[in-house]
Amino acid sequence: MKAAVLFGNEDIRYDTWETPEVKPGTVKVRVRATGICGSDVPRVLHHGAHFYPVVLGHEFSGDVVEVGEGVKDLSIGDTVSGAPLVPCMNCGDCQQGNFALCKHYSFIGSRQQGSFAEYVVIPAQNAVKYDPSIPYKQAAMFEPSTVAIHGLLQADYKGGETVAILGCGTIGIFTLQWAKIFGAKKIVAFDIDDGRLALAKRMGADDVINTLKSDFMEYANEITGKQGYQNVFETAGNPVTMRMAFDLAANKAHVCFIGTPHTDLTFTPKLWENMNRKEFHLTGSWMSYSAPFPGREWDLTAHYFQTGELKFDIGFIFREYPLSRVAEAFALYKDPSQVHGKIMLTND
């Protein structure tokens, strides 16, 4: 088969790769659409791969074309997305249902062959069926949607309160939508890109704020009557927005860090005192899994994609390339300011 093979740093090529074979308990999926995740970028451009050669890709959708021995709930022709985490199921965290914290996990698209290929073989329990009326490109967004709702679950989100979304990338927009689905009183989205803010508005934000404006914090405070936001979800993984979360939080707020920073983050004594005096609850959120595996995050995404309440907008996708042009797609990330949304790879 053909695949996008990473042979070394900045050396990703559309090349021949051994077609994976189905084993007991697995299914083979013909990949129709697969998104480039932010975590793929350092693996390709910044020496972040675990080994070479490797086929990356973990946000995908496609059709089941072969079913391994012992698989009962999947059939040839089923449309599926894939949960990329492959937990050991034996360590203490797995036994408690904390699969994302597994000590001995594998991961489709980084530690084993991923979806930047014509075919991928995955454990049957990782294949998430969805209604075939959902377009492949939308279904390739399963994983970022589940990351978003996992953050809400980690923050014990219950609705009926004010919500600040920091960062309007793919995960930020899904976080916004989940907050709205589950009854937010008011949602305000923050970003530096007017195009992303326009998308946030279309997806249900009550107000949007460009943080490049000098008076943005004053306006943000006016919206809540200077009470702060009862729920703050940081999705950008940027030290600026992570510190901003502390300033926007209300007394007794829930603050959740979903984004992952790639540079050092320094908390000043003033910021720390801000947290202490407000007595807000700060939590991290890692991946998107719960018991029974892969979890309600995946079931809820399938359901709300089907009902149409969890929306897909063409604005999610910045560029679309055939898999054969994968090197061209990753070249854009050498200047991240060129990329304003998800880059989607497709197989004809």
Task: Tell where the protein language model's regions lie, with residue ranges.
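C-terminal hydrophobic helical "lid"/dimerization subdomain
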Residues: 1-3, 243-247, 296-348
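Short Gly/Pro-enriched turn/cap motifs at secondary-structure boundaries
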Residues: 7, 18-19, 51-57, 75, ...
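Glycine-rich beta-strand-centered segment in the early N-terminal region that forms part
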Residues: 20-34, 47-92, 131-134
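NAD(P)H dinucleotide-binding glycine-rich loop of Rossmann-like/cofactor-binding domains
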Residues: 88-166
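Mid-domain Rossmann-like dinucleotide-binding core that forms the NAD(H)/NADP(H) cofactor-binding site
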Residues: 134-214, 218
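Glycine-rich cofactor phosphate-binding loops and adjacent beta1-alpha1 units
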Residues: 155-158, 203-281
